[in-house]
């Protein structure tokens, strides 16, 4: 018998395979990460793809909303937010005009002791922070999607002159991939919007075309 140990949550489980049935295992090729994470983020901000630099988009007097992931995601937001604030400062945006929104979607609000871990002490001192409340009645209607979803989003986010989405792109057990546009829906959207959008999972292709 061959014992094959498989990661399972925070532990491992053993699969015992008869030797005659075991052909071998294919291991992923290990890739080392960057050694200077902040430097890479600063480089990305100075060399954006398909758009102008953030400090050319934002200007003095603008209200800026930065959406970051909540405590249920292992996104290194603390590495991203500080360089973003520096880039906005170079554009003339004052710290008091920046709001960091924890994109909680339908999750609970971020606890005070979690905020520093998520975005870092420096960012907490410089910018305002709020947790999105999907049950709040103070949301702004933006319109309908092609699937008929009424889109209501966080008022602070909607009224910001400049909106910055942060996060990671990763595999998702329902949607295939998660990240990117999820920083708007569901992250800063209303209960009605989230529920209707998630229900689209059950649509057939015919229903989606109607």
Model-based region annotation:
Residues 1-41:
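N-terminal amphipathic/basic leader segments beginning at the initiator methionine
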Residues 63-74, 99-105:
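Short glycine-rich or small-residue beta-strand-to-loop segments that form or flank ligand, phosphate
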Residues 173-193:
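A short, gly/pro- and small-residue-rich
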Residues 203-208:
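Conserved small/polar residues in nucleotide/adenosyl-binding loops
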């Amino acid at each position: 018998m061959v014992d094959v140990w498989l990661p399972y949550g925070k532990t491992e489980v053993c699969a015992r395979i008869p030797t005659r049935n075991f052909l071998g295992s294919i291991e992923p090729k290990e890739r080392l990460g960057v050694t200077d994470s902040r430097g890479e983020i600063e480089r990305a901000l100075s060399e954006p793809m398909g758009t102008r630099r953030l400090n050319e988009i934002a200007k003095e007097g603008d209200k800026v909303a930065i959406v970051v992931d909540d405590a249920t995601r292992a996104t290194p937001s603390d590495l991203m937010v500080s360089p973003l604030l520096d880039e906005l400062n170079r554009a003339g945006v004052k710290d008091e005009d920046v709001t960091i929104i924890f994109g909680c979607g339908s999750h609970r609000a971020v606890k005070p002791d979690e905020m520093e871990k998520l975005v870092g002490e420096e960012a907490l001192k410089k910018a305002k922070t709020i947790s999105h409340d999907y049950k709040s009645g103070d949301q702004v209607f933006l319109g309908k999607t092609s699937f008929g979803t009424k889109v209501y989003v966080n008022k602070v986010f909607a009224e910001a002159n400049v909106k910055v989405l942060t996060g990671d792109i990763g595999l998702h057990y329902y949607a295939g991939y998660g990240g990117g546009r999820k920083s708007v829906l569901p992250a800063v959207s209303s209960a009605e919007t989230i529920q209707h959008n998630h229900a689209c999972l059950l649509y057939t292709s015919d229903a989606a075309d109607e």
